[in-house]
Regions:
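Conserved ATP-dependent adenylate/AMP-binding module captured primarily in the ANL superfamily
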Residues: 8-9, 50-86, 107-109, 147-164
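Short, well-ordered alpha-helical microsegments
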Residues: 28-31, 81-84, 174
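Short acidic, glycine/proline-enriched helix-loop-strand junctions
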Residues: 84-101
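Conserved AMP-binding/adenylate-forming
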Residues: 6-53, 166-168
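Conserved pre-ATP/AMP-binding loop-to-beta segment of ANL
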Residues: 98-133, 138, 143, 147, ...
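Conserved AMP-binding loop of ANL adenylate-forming enzymes
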Residues: 22, 154-175
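Generic beta-strand/beta-sheet core signal
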Residues: 23, 77, 124, 137-142, ...
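Motif I (Walker A/P-loop) of helicase-class P-loop NTPases
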Residues: 33, 140, 175
């Protein structure tokens, strides 16, 4: 229900293929925002939430990702969105719209959901930037399905299987 209502809000408010930076603490909010973007036809760009203690390191990395990915939207929590003016994140085309996703959105029943195409961009994954500027990798819908199939075959996954991942959502294996 959370993913569907947020996806409906995003689909009504932003054009398809909008690049959406995801800035969340580790948890379900990040997963819901990621899948809401996918369902709405937006392109999620997962990144670590800024750590107030390490802003000197984190902000240049975030700014690099925003510029490279042409981000125009940030999805996050109300707590992090309240810091938006302090973070001064923008891109070359202007300010970034901030949306706090931890508030309820109306359920959407009559929306035409986009149908993903195999070569369409599913999401942008960025390297950590620990040794250089973060570099983005374009992950297609086909890449996601092939990866899921490979993991299913290697892990003996069935319809009744459940999994748990402790990696951060912005890590390539965290998704």
């Amino acid at each position: 229900h959370v993913v569907r209502s947020l996806a409906g809000h995003l689909a009504r408010t932003f054009p398809a293929s909008t690049r959406a930076l995801l800035l969340y603490p580790q948890g379900l909010d990040a997963a819901c925002a990621f899948w809401a973007c996918v369902c709405a036809g937006l392109v999620p760009v997962p990144a670590p939430a800024p750590d107030p203690i390490r802003l000197k390191y984190g902000l240049p990395r975030l700014r690099s990702i925003i510029e490279d990915a042409h981000v125009s939207l940030t999805l996050t929590t109300s707590r992090i969105a309240a810091l938006s003016s302090e973070l001064s994140l923008a891109n070359e085309t202007g300010p970034i719209t901030w949306v706090a996703t931890d508030q309820p959105y109306d359920s959407i029943d009559s929306i035409e959901w986009p149908q993903p195409q195999g070569n369409a961009l599913a999401y942008l994954q960025y390297t950590s930037g620990s040794t250089a500027t973060p570099r983005g990798v374009m992950i297609s819908q086909r890449n996601v399905l092939a990866h899921c199939k490979a993991l299913s075959l290697a892990g003996g996954v069935s319809d009744s299987s459940r999994s748990l991942c402790w990696l951060p959502y912005f890590h390539d294996y965290g998704l």
